[in-house]
UniProtKB/Swiss-Prot annotation:
Species annotation: Aphanothece halophytica
Residues passing through the membrane, by range: 19-39, 42-62, 95-115, 127-147, 165-185, 195-215, 246-266, 277-297, 312-332, 350-370, 381-401
Family per similarity comment: Belongs to the monovalent cation:proton antiporter 1 (CPA1) transporter (TC 2.A.36) family.
The protein's name in its UniProt record: Na(+)/H(+) antiporter ApNhaP
pH dependence, entry free text: Active over a wide pH range between 5 and 9.
Record gene name: apnhaP
Keyword field: Antiport, Cell inner membrane, Cell membrane, Ion transport, Membrane, Sodium, Sodium transport, Transmembrane, Transmembrane helix, Transport
Domain comment in the entry: The C-terminal tail could affect ion specificity.
Compartment(s): Cell inner membrane
Keyword Transmembrane attached: yes
Length: 521
């Protein structure tokens, strides 16, 4: 064996060991946070950062990835999963405020944070603007989970999810346009920047659209869940790489293909079981990638450097909070003046305080070129902001929602659903008892007693509880109708999809059928 071959094998072995360490530690910590009642109170992402810091403190470095690889590995799955899960039908109703917050909001964040850091911390303007672009990307995953737990209104959830999805893409484009300025590889020009921005966006949307619709129609031709699941993974990474090669924004391409496959392809080309399989697959992928990213940021931090940059971190946090408030309340007012659906000041406050920073900002910070002076300052400033948003904003979010009176009726709806389920179960029990044939092993008296007991429980206890709930919470009366309506939409959409796959219905659907296929799950 040659020396080169031996060195190559040793490098592969070392990289594999590093990967297995990262895999074991990240999933181990994430799992611990779910099974322990004490750790369950702490966001698992925060636990991962703490473990990463601990490993860095004892000088155990987990893995060394090039900045380019960090973006190519971590961004596509995070963005695709977010785009796959957002429902276009809901997003379309709030598209204007979402786009306003995502595009103009990113510009305000980049300029506001950049000039604030330049003025108050002495950071050079190109580096400060780069920090602003990195921190323009919001990542409210834990806040959205809290929304669903507390029953916060659907519109507020869509606004926050939609803003996060689109501003991630815009922030990454802004980052790619600004990162060359401090390196001296490009000069800033408003005209050239706008042209480049439109070009990146256009190529990204075009590539994502072609690949998304192509895979959507391809999956109509077969019913192989694992192949369809694999195609979504290939589409996420493939779209990113192809779009980047063509000179566009891979991030915008991934967001586009995710929206198309999640809202169109999953309807016309996948049966319900496959859709569930793919959704669960991407839920795991996002969980896994988030785990690794938050572990790596802790691993990359220099403890002494973090303490030395305390003033820079504090200035960055203050600038971020103030600029975010200006952006949300200002753009919210503009949106209210133009659209008919007002965003209340309570909702604006939640959007402001819930704009956490997370995986995308961390991935961008870690992807800053190594040769750039001030790279470590950027990483530590971003880490400080992410830590603040997780610890302070994330942990106080429930209190803010409660004080603003935005908690919905989720708990009552859950109890009401359980009562309906109990009633259905008792009805099935009665139907089964009525169908029991005479048998020597079953005493008729016992059977009759059991029937009467079940019937009495159904007619008195369950009926009284449901009536009481209906009187106490009138808004719950439509719950059964909502569930039935959603069920009929699912059955109807699945029937059309089956007919299309069987060749009994034309691919070119009428607007009516397209609307049915676009109904949310």
């Amino acid at each position: 064996m040659t020396i080169e071959a031996a060195m190559g094998e040793e490098a592969i072995k070392e990289n594999l060991e590093q990967f297995l360490i990262v895999l074991s530690v990240s999933l181990g910590v994430a799992t611990l946070s779910q099974i322990s009642s004490f750790f369950r109170q702490i966001p698992y992402t925060l636990l991962l950062v703490i473990v990463g810091l601990g490993l860095a403190f004892v000088d155990i470095r987990l893995v060394n990835l090039s900045p380019e690889l960090i973006l190519e590995i971590f961004l596509p799955p995070l963005l695709f999963e977010a785009a796959w899960n957002i429902r276009w039908r809901n997003l379309k109703k709030n598209l204007f405020p979402v786009v306003l917050l995502a595009i103009i909001g990113v510009v305000i964040s980049v300029v506001g944070i950049g000039f604030s850091l330049n003025y108050f911390s002495g950071l050079s303007l190109p580096i400060a603007l780069l920090v602003g672009a990195i921190l323009a990307a919001t990542d409210p995953v834990s806040v959205i989970a809290l929304f669903r737990e507390l029953g916060v209104g659907e519109r507020l959830t869509v606004l926050m999810e939609g803003e996060s999805l689109f501003n991630d893409g815009v922030a990454v484009v802004a980052f790619s346009l600004l990162v060359g300025i401090p390196l001296g590889t490009q000069e800033f020009s408003v005209t050239n920047t706008l042209i480049q921005f439109v070009t990146l966006q256009g190529i990204g949307i075009g590539c994502g659209g072609v690949i998304g619709f192509g895979i959507s129609y391809l999956t109509q031709r077969f019913d192989l869940p694992l192949v369809e699941q694999s195609l979504t993974l290939v589409s996420a990474y493939g779209t990113y790489l192809i779009t980047e090669e063509l000179g566009g924004s891979g991030v915008i391409g991934v967001v586009t293909v995710g929206l198309i496959l999640g809202n169109f392809g999953s309807r016309i080309g996948m049966n319900p079981r496959t859709r569930l399989l793919v959704s669960e697959f991407w839920e795991f992928i996002a969980f896994f990638v988030n785990s690794i990213v938050f572990l790596l940021i802790g691993d990359q931090i220099n403890i002494r450097g973090l303490a030395d940059n305390g003033q820079l971190i504090l200035i960055t946090i203050i600038a971020l909070v103030i600029i975010r408030a200006i952006s949300i309340y200002g753009l919210g007012t503009i949106s209210n003046l133009i659209t008919k659906q007002d965003i209340s000041w309570q909702e604006e406050t939640v959007l402001w305080w819930g704009g956490l920073r997370g995986s995308v900002s961390i991935a961008l910070a870690l992807s800053v070129p190594v040769m750039l002076d001030g790279r470590q300052d950027i990483i530590e400033a971003v880490f400080g902001v992410v830590l603040f948003t997780l610890l302070v904003q994330g942990l106080t979010m429930q209190t803010v929602i409660e004080k603003l009176g935005l908690i919905g009726d989720r708990a009552q709806r859950r109890t009401y659903s359980e009562l309906i389920a109990r009633r259905s179960a008792l009805e099935r029990v009665l139907a089964h008892l009525n169908a029991v044939p005479p048998s020597p092993s079953i005493r008729m008296k016992s059977l009759k007693t059991t029937k009467e007991a079940s019937k009495g429980q159904l007619e008195s206890r369950q009926t009284k509880k449901l009536r009481s709930y209906n009187n106490s919470y009138p808004q719950l009366r439509s719950l059964e109708q909502e569930q039935l309506r959603e069920l009929t939409f699912k059955v109807e959409a699945d029937t059309y999809a089956e007919l299309i796959r069987a060749g009994k219905l034309n691919n070119n659907l009428s607007p009516l059928l397209q609307e049915v296929l676009a109904k949310p799950e």
